[in-house]
C-alpha cells in the first residue's frame, strides 16, 4: 500500500517560524511554531539573527513531523512564505552572515532613503519598481550593511558575498548552498527589481553601488528550485517548489486569481492586495504597485495598500486602556453599544499608512460626550479599522478603474463578526471570510503542489478553500456616506493637529 503524500509549508514570520503540513484537500494535518528573539540595538532599529531563524525553521520542521507521525518521504514538495523585505548578507563560501538580518520594520537605513529622495530619484524608482522610496524595502538595507561592515563592499565586488531576503536564505540553507534564488513577489519588494522588464535594474544597482553578483536568480512562484539536502530535512530529498512573500501568498491562498479580486489580511496591521492582471498599473494615489504572483511564464501584477494599525488597536484596548480582558470580548462590548456612531477613533499611533502616508500623525478621538460609554469607545475603535480599509479600497478603485464587488478576508480580526458586518456596510460590498484562515501557508502549499502535479491546476484549487461566511451590506446609502464623511473629517483634523505642532516648533 502506497503512503499518503502531503505538502509542507514553511511560514517564516517576523516573530516566529511555523511549519504546516497540508493534505490533498487543503486541510491542515499538523503544525509546529517557534518564536525567536528580536534584536533592538538602538531606538527604531529591528534586527534578527539569521542563524536563529534557520534554527527555528529546523525545529518546526521536526515538530510538524513528530506531531503527525508523517515521515519526510511522505512530503511531496515544500512551499516557503516569508516576512518580506528583511535582508541577509552572507559569505558565499562559509554560509555565515556578515551582519544580523535587518528587518522590514527597521528605520536604521532611513537616512539613505532620504538622500535618494533629495537627489531626485523618486520618479525613476517608482516607475521601475512600483514602490515609493523608503527604508522599508531591501535596497537601503543592503547598502547599509556594505557601508557598516568593514571590507564588505570590497568582498561583494570580488563576488565573495551573497544577498537574500528570507526566502532566499532558507532555500540556500535547505539545499546546503546549492541554490541561490528568489521569486517574483520577493524580488519586487527589494526596490532593486524592474517589475516591468522582470530584471534586476542596472541603473538602480549602479546608483546604490550594489554589485549584481550578490543578487539571487529570480524565478517564478511555482517551479522546482532545488531539493533539500537529506541531512537538512531528516533524511528526505524533497523538491522546494513554491515561494511567495507573505501577503502575496495570502492572495494566492484566497484564490484571488482574476483581475479585480481583492484580499485583506487583518493582522497587527492590515494588508490589502488587489490582483490587477497582466498589466502593471502605477498608482497616482500612494498605493504600491507590486507583483502578485507569476506562474507558467505569466505575471499577475497587484496594487497594495498597507494600514499600520488594525488588530493592534484591539490590543491597545486590552493592554493599554484595560477596557477589555481578551480581544474577542471587543465584539460583545461593541454590540452592547447604544450610540449613534458619533464617536471616531483615529488610531494613528505610528502615523497613517496608505493612502495618507503621514508619519507625523498621532492617535486622536472625536465626538465624545458625557454619555459616551466604554462600549461606545470599543465600537468606535473597531469601526476605525473598517474606515481605514475603505480609504484603501476607494483608492484602489480609482487607480485601477475596476469596480470591486467583493473583499476576501482573513487574519485574526476577521473572526470578529461585528467588524466584518460593519466592513460590509461601510464598503457597500460583500465580505467573504475564508473558511480556512491559514491562507498564507495555504498559498505557499498551493504554489508548491502545483509545480509537482500534486494538484492538477488552479481550477482544482478552487474547491479547496471555499468561503466560510459571507457578510452582505445592509446599511442604507445616506447613513453609510454620513458616517464615512465623519471619518474623513476626523482624519483631516488629526493631520491638522500635528501640522500645527510642527508649525509651532518651526516658529521657535
UniProtKB/Swiss-Prot annotation:
Annotated ATP binding sites: 14-16, 268, 311, 315, 412
Activity control mechanisms: Activated by phosphorylation and inhibited by fructose 1,6-bisphosphate (FBP).
Show the GO cellular component annotation of the record: cytosol
- A single Gene Ontology molecular function, please? ATP binding
> What sections of the sequence does the record tag as coiled-coil?
none
InterPro entries hit by this protein = ATPase_NBD, Carb_kinase_FGGY, Carb_kinase_FGGY_CS, FGGY_C, FGGY_N, Glycerol_kin
Q: Which reaction does it catalyse?
A: glycerol + ATP = sn-glycerol 3-phosphate + ADP + H(+)
Tell me the residue numbers annotated for binding sn-glycerol 3-phosphate.
14, 84-85, 136, 246
Sites where Phosphohistidine occurs are at 232
Its biological purpose: Key enzyme in the regulation of glycerol uptake and metabolism. Catalyzes the phosphorylation of glycerol to yield sn-glycerol 3-phosphate.
- Full protein name: Glycerol kinase
Name the source organism: Streptococcus pyogenes serotype M4 (strain MGAS10750)
Amino acid at each position: 500500500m502506497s503512503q499518503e503524500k502531503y505538502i509542507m509549508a514553511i511560514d517564516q514570520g517576523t516573530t516566529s517560524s511555523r511549519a504546516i503540513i497540508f493534505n490533498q484537500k487543503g486541510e491542515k494535518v499538523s503544525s509546529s511554531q517557534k518564536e525567536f528573539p528580536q534584536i533592538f540595538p538602538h531606538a527604531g532599529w529591528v534586527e534578527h539573527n539569521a542563524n536563529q531563524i534557520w534554527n527555528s525553521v529546523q525545529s518546526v520542521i521536526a515538530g510538524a513531523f513528530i506531531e503527525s507521525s508523517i515521515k519526510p518521504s511522505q512530503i511531496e514538495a515544500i512551499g516557503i512564505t516569508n516576512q518580506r523585505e528583511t535582508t541577509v548578507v552572507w559569505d558565499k563560501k562559509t554560509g555565515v552572515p556578515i551582519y544580523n538580518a535587518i528587518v522590514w520594520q527597521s528605520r536604521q537605513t532611513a537616512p539613505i532613503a532620504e538622500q535618494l529622495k533629495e537627489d531626485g530619484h523618486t520618479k525613476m524608482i517608482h516607475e521601475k519598481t512600483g514602490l515609493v522610496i523608503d527604508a522599508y524595502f531591501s535596497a537601503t538595507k543592503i547598502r547599509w550593511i556594505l557601508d557598516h561592515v568593514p571590507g564588505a563592499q570590497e568582498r561583494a565586488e570580488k563576488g565573495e558575498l551573497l544577498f537574500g531576503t528570507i526566502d532566499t536564505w532558507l532555500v540556500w540553507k535547505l539545499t546546503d548552498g546549492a541554490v541561490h534564488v528568489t521569486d517574483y513577489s520577493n524580488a519586487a519588494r527589494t526596490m532593486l527589481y524592474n517589475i516591468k522588464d522582470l530584471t534586476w535594474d542596472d541603473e538602480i544597482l549602479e546608483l546604490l553601488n550594489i554589485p549584481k553578483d550578490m543578487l539571487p536568480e529570480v524565478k517564478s512562484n511555482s517551479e522546482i528550485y532545488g531539493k533539500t539536502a537529506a541531512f537538512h530535512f531528516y533524511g528526505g530529498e524533497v523538491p522546494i517548489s513554491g515561494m511567495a512573500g507573505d501577503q502575496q501568498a495570502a492572495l494566492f491562498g484566497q484564490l484571488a486569481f482574476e483581475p479585480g479580486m481583492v484580499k485583506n489580511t487583518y493582522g497587527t496591521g492590515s494588508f490589502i492586495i488587489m490582483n490587477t492582471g497582466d498589466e502593471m498599473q502605477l498608482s497616482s494615489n500612494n498605493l504600491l504597485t507590486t507583483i502578485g504572483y507569476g506562474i507558467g511564464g505569466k505575471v499577475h501584477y497587484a496594487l497594495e495598500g498597507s494600514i499600520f494599525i488594525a488588530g493592534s488597536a484591539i490590543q491597545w484596548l486590552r493592554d493599554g486602556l484595560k477596557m477589555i480582558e481578551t480581544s474577542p470580548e471587543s465584539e460583545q462590548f461593541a454590540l452592547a453599544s447604544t450610540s449613534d456612531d458619533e464617536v471616531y477613533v483615529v488610531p494613528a499611533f505610528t502615523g497613517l499608512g496608505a493612502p495618507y502616508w503621514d508619519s507625523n500623525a498621532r492617535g486622536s478621538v472625536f465626538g465624545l460626550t458625557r454619555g459616551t460609554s466604554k462600549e461606545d469607545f470599543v465600537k468606535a475603535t473597531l469601526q476605525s479599522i473598517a474606515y481605514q480599509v475603505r480609504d484603501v479600497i476607494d483608492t484602489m478603485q480609482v487607480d485601477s478603474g475596476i469596480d470591486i464587488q467583493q473583499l476576501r478576508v482573513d487574519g485574526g480580526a476577521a473572526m470578529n463578526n461585528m467588524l466584518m458586518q460593519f466592513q460590509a456596510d461601510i464598503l457597500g460590498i460583500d465580505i467573504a471570510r475564508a473558511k480556512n484562515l491559514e491562507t498564507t501557508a495555504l498559498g505557499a502549499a498551493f504554489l508548491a503542489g502545483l509545480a509537482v502535479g500534486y494538484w492538477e491546476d488552479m481550477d482544482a484549487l478552487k474547491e479547496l478553500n471555499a468561503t466560510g461566511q459571507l457578510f452582505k451590506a445592509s446599511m442604507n446609502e445616506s447613513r453609510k456616506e454620513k458616517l464615512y464623511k465623519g471619518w474623513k473629517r476626523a482624519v483631516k483634523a488629526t493631520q491638522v493637529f500635528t501640522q500645527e505642532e510642527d508649525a509651532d516648533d518651526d516658529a521657535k
